[in-house]
Design a protein with these regions (language model features):
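Conserved catalytic cores of very large enzyme subunits
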Residues: 1-183
């Protein structure tokens, strides 16, 4: 009865989805913690390499409490520690498989990832992979003119001219409004 009243008072919006069981729309798991500590619940060990890291992330995305993942993390920040420990071409191959799987496994979800504002090898490779594969997965560059290198920003601009992404986010304003850990 209380829930029905909240629906009638427009406190709760059903998003025109009908009488489906309630589940959160947007969740923000701590993916960094998952990679560093693993998950007893999902029987995942801490990631030791890029293969482990991408497998753990895909597993976590699959079991998102919202049914579909929405924000899949600051991927360059999450993956760079693993990318930087392997040959670039090998890392590129793993990232291609990962990005393709994200695109194919969650085609009907508004899935998005962030990179930047710092330039990392993982961020540069993800831009390269995205440009090559032309997937629909959303990608945003957290841009900060005092931090983001011009060549990294230009790589993102070249992608945007071909793919209409990455999107550019004013990182300093977001930090000002929401703090360093915004999503």
């Amino acid at each position: 009865a209380a829930a029905q009243k909240m629906i009638e008072d427009e406190v709760i919006c059903l998003l025109s989805e009908g009488p489906a069981p309630f589940h959160p729309r947007y969740t923000a798991p701590n993916y960094k913690r998952l990679l560093e500590q693993g998950s007893a619940f999902m029987d995942l060990k801490p990631a030791e390499n890029l293969y482990d890291a991408t497998a753990s992330l895909l597993t976590a995305y699959h079991y998102a409490p919202s049914g579909e993942p929405v924000f899949i993390g600051r991927l360059d920040d999450l993956l760079d520690p693993y990318v930087s420990r392997m040959p670039e071409e090998q890392a590129l191959a793993v990232l291609k498989n990962f990005w393709l799987l994200v695109d194919r496994l969650f085609p009907n979800a508004f899935v998005h990832a962030d990179i930047g504002p710092e330039a990392t090898l993982a961020g540069r490779l993800l831009l390269r992979v995205d440009r090559e594969l032309k997937t629909i997965t959303n990608l945003t560059l957290r841009y900060d003119p005092s931090v983001t290198p011009v060549d990294f920003a230009l790589q993102a601009v070249e992608n945007a001219l071909q793919l209409a992404k990455p999107y550019f986010l004013n990182h300093p304003l977001m930090v000002q409004d929401w703090g360093d850990d915004y999503i």
